[in-house]
Amino acid sequence: MEKFTQKWAIVSLLEDVEEGSEFYFTDFPLHVTLAGVFSTPADKDQLVHGLAGLLRKQSLIEIEADEADFFGPNEDIPVMRIKQSGELKKLHLQIHDWLTSLHVEYNSPQYQGSGYHPHCTVQRDTSLSLGEQRVLTSVSLIDLFPNNDGYQRKIVKTIQLG
């Protein structure tokens, strides 16, 4: 029996998905991860208000799909790496520093902060193409344990950029 606990992630969705939407973990919309899976003693309201304050003056960020690759312990998760721009790195580090102040524990801390590798995981029905350019227009807080269900995901809050 798997044991699930409250976890969160912060992403920039590349598809239009309404705030409050729930979906099965295998149906995650196309996105760029800005903060990987984490737990924290902070509650949902603290996360929502803190993230909104942090992003208050954040401008849109242009991204470009740079290289196909495989992630994961078995290198079997197909991803499209995103070119690491100064703006994207700065956004990740701002989020990382803020989360550090909330005493988060990451599932994979080696990929946060200086170990951040921006990417877009290939989803069932969609992915980025090599060289494809997009604009990050929002940042979303994702609940990875809505209604005590570790297989569901919920978009708790989406904050528009720019």
Stretch-by-stretch model annotation:
Residues 73:
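Extracellular/luminal beta-rich ligand-recognition
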Residues 1-64, 70, 85-143, 155-162:
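Basic, often amphipathic N-terminal segments
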Residues 148-152:
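A two-mode feature
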Residues 76-87:
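Short histidine-centered catalytic/ligand-binding loop motif
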